[in-house]
C-alpha cells in the first residue's frame, strides 16, 4: 500500500496510555528544556526593566518618549521578527528528531536570511517614526525623543535577526542551558553598559538604545562561540551539530527539493508571525482604549502595571510552550507519535498547575504588587481590583499558550493564528469595548474583555489539541522532513494489511 493510503489505517492503532514512569520521565525532559528558557525570559525582563528605569532617571520627557518608542518598536519590529522566527520550529525540530541535521542547519540559515529581509522595511518604518507620530498629533518633544531611540535601535534588528533563529535552533536540539548562561552574562553587563552610555558619556535615551543592542550583540557573540567550540569537539567524535561551512543555498536545483524548504518555511513563518502579533498587539490595543476612559491617567497607569504583570507571568507559560514544541516536534520527526502525545498531555497538565499558582499569587499579592510601581492611592485601588482578574486570565492563558506550542511542534501554526484572531478580535475586543464604555465598567471592563478572549482561545485550541490524530501527524512529519524514519506502529499496521490483501 502507498503512503497516500496510510491515513485509512491510522484508526487501527490501539489507544496508547502512558505509564507513570513515562509521565515522570517526560516531565523531567520538559523541565530540563523549560527551566533555562524561563530563566532567560526573566533575565530579559530584568534587562528591559533596567532600560526603563534608566530612562526614568533622565526625566519625565525621556521616559514618555522612550515608552512610546519601546511600544512602537515592539509592535512593528520585535514582534514581527519573533513571530517569523517561530516558523522554523516545526521544520527544525522535526528534522532533528528524524536525524536530518542538514535540513535543520539549512532551515536555520534561511530563517536568518528571512529575518534580515524583514528588517529592511521595518528599518524604513522606524526611520520615519517622527512624521508618522506628528501626523497622529503626538507631542513634538515626545516624538523627537522616540525618534532618536528608534534610530539608534536599528542595529538591534540585525542582532535579533541572528539571535532568534539561533536560540530556536539550539532549543530544538534540547540545548537550552548555554542559552541561559549566555543571557546571564550579557544581562549582568547590561547595567554598567547602560550607565556608561546613558549617564557617563551623556548620550541619554540614544545611550539606552545602544546599550540594548550591545547587550544582545554580546549574547549573540557568546552563542556563536559556543557553537564553534561544540563543532570543534564534535569534529573529533561525531558529526557537526551545525554545518557552518556549508553554503546558504538561497535557491536549489529543480530536483533537489531545496526550494521546497523555502516555500515550507514561509508557509509556517507567516501564520506564526500573525499568531504572535495578534496576541501581542491586543495589549497595545487595550492600552490605547485606556487612554479614552473618563480618568485616562489612572487607567493608563494601571494598564502599565497590568502589562508588566502579564509580561512577568508570561515567562513560565512561554518556557513550557517552547519545551513542548521541541518535544512534540522531535518525537513526531522520530516517528514516535505516542511519545509526542505523552509530551503534549504532560505539558497541558503542568500548565494547569502553573495557572492555579498564578491565580493564587496574584490574588494574595494584589495590594503589595502595585506598590512596587507606584504610591498613588487611586492607581493602587484600581490595580488591586483588576489584578485578580488578570490572575483569572492566567487560568486560560497558560493552557492556551502551551497548546500553541503543541500546534507549532506539529506543524499547524495556521490553526493558532485563526484561533487568536477569532478569540482576541471577534470575542475579546467587542466584549472589552461594550463593558468598558457602554456598561461603564471602565478599565475593569477592558480586563474582563481580556478574560473573555483568553477563555475563548483556550477552549478552542484545547479542543483542537484533544482531537489531534497523532499517528497522522507522525506521517505528515515523515513527509515533511523524514526520509529515514516512519512511525513503527503504523508501519507494522501497513505490513499486516498488505499480508491480508494477499
Swiss-Prot record:
Q: Which domain of life is it from?
A: Eukaryota
Q: Which InterPro entries match?
A: MATE_euk, MATE_fam
Q: Which residues form the signal peptide?
A: none
Keyword check for Transport, yes or no: yes
**Is the Transmembrane helix keyword given for this protein?**
yes
User: What CDD domains does the entry give?
Assistant: MATE_eukaryotic
Keyword terms: Membrane, Transmembrane, Transmembrane helix, Transport
Recorded GO cellular component terms are: membrane
Q: Name one GO molecular function term.
A: antiporter activity
Localization recorded for this chain is: Membrane
How does this chain sit within the bilayer?
Answer: Multi-pass membrane protein
TM stretches of this protein: 30-50, 61-81, 112-132, 145-165, 185-205, 207-227, 261-283, 298-318, 344-364, 378-398, 419-439, 447-467
Which Gene Ontology BP terms does the record give?
xenobiotic detoxification by transmembrane export across the plasma membrane
The record's comment on protein family reads: Belongs to the multi antimicrobial extrusion (MATE) (TC 2.A.66.1) family.
- What is this protein identified as? Protein DETOXIFICATION 55
Q: Which gene encodes it?
A: DTX55
